[in-house]
């Protein structure tokens, strides 16, 4: 409280020198023979803490605090100054400065006598030297800051009474801050307090009058403390050239410094927020109040306010705010004044209106017929002769009268009053004339179809327009172009004569429409009518079997239809008649008459391989005795085989139809189909076994014909 702390403007050179000398002396004293007892360490720590507490006092920003600092510095300057001489690096002087202890140190020693008993004489000398050095530091600090002391004297004139009272009480300065700092340190370090209690139980240390032997070893030096590094910018020679230009620019600026924004209080913040809710008062009264408040504030600023000393926490906050303001001002000074924006005058200039562009109309390609290229012009459609086709006129629908419209709309609800003309019945189609399609009978009621000119052109003509026709001889069209491997070989006999092809079977006569309708509608009619049907020839029955081969016979014959269903039967008959007319006559397929042997011979070669037993030379001697018996030991062949061999010379349908006259026609058709299949298979085997067939034919001539053949003739 009584002594001010060091100012921030003081240079750091004397402090570093004092710190270096202090560390050098402390090392020498330890090497000479300082005791290492815990009681002595305790006393030294307490004295250093007290000296540090008195040396570091917080700064104050109010006028009263400045006056107290200045008066305290004056009282210190009135005391005789202590001259510090540079100590040699050799042995330090013992007991040279025991009398230079400050008054507050002696007062603290009297109050804490029970703690100082544990200190030794050698430890007292170390404490006295440290206290004297701390005193010299405090005396050097105000001497370096003489300008600040001189500036603060003018402020202290307003508080003379306070300064006089403090001069009288200078000799009796209280030691309360020291005690508070010691108590805080003792509270913070609970481990040290526990160690103090243990040390007190040991008792007082015995006084030893014997001096420790002097230290004769080498001098211990700390190279890091002895080196001095100059900070960049302390001297003018260390300032870089780039930063010198900034300093020169700042010196040339003579404008007023910007006012730092003042912190707003709670009342000002409430007034600013509540300004939107309060009603606005008249302007005349407000200006008068502002003038009166301005004059009163000026009058009050002339006098100096006297207030109590703020606590330490508030002092720290005020000092931090002052330092922040000073740092911001220093930064703002380095920036300089704001230069005017070169583009600001352009905004204020008048905008020049440009002349509107002239609109010119340009003709686009394709708007007129002249601008359309010849390649993209529409070509009119032409006939085969090259004449342009005229568009066909659209047929306009005839307007219906009101009565006709009402009749068409009310047809679903009521019988229309307007009756159309009775339509003429369509002419009956003759049975000889057959239409092209059954759908055309329905299309006649829709009207005539318009002919499209494009329909007349065939697809072949369209292809000829784009591609040229070139005749290429295909492989195999002529016998010369067929390769020898793929040429058909003529089938020859054993003698080398070519075999003549078999005569084609007799073609079936074309069937009449009535016969086909009767054959198709036999399932719909009664079974009595089925029995009445008679076939003239056996060949006709085979033709019917080809058309209706897979129709199954009805298992349950229906009874005679009731009389009410006669009309429906007639309608069905008429529909069947129309369908049968659309079918037309059946044309025979030329591929059906070809035997299967021809198809096979086209792909593979017919090679005759001699089989064992065909000649006498090839018969083994073991089986020759069978031929000598002339077939006496052979069993008789069944009649079924003979009947199958007879089918080659005689029509099988004629041979088998006599046994099946009593059966219904459906069974006959199924049996005929099976016989035809057997006929085809037998014909395929006939080419391979030609010699056997000749022998079998000779044997069949000798065998008498059965009774079935006699009945057929």
UniProtKB/Swiss-Prot annotation:
Query: Is Ribosomal protein set as a keyword in this record?
Result: no
- Bias type Basic and acidic residues, positions: 351-365, 376-387, 448-505, 588-648, 687-713
Native organism:
Rattus norvegicus (Rat)
Q: What does this protein do?
A: Specific inhibition of calpain (calcium-dependent cysteine protease). Plays a key role in postmortem tenderization of meat and have been proposed to be involved in muscle protein degradation in living tissue.
Which keywords does the record carry? Acetylation, Isopeptide bond, Phosphoprotein, Protease inhibitor, Repeat, Thiol protease inhibitor, Ubl conjugation
Report what the protein is called: Calpastatin
Covalent link location (Glycyl lysine isopeptide (Lys-Gly) (interchain with G-Cter in SUMO2)): 69
Q: Which GO terms describe its molecular function?
A: calcium-dependent cysteine-type endopeptidase inhibitor activity; protease binding
Q: Which gene encodes it?
A: Cast
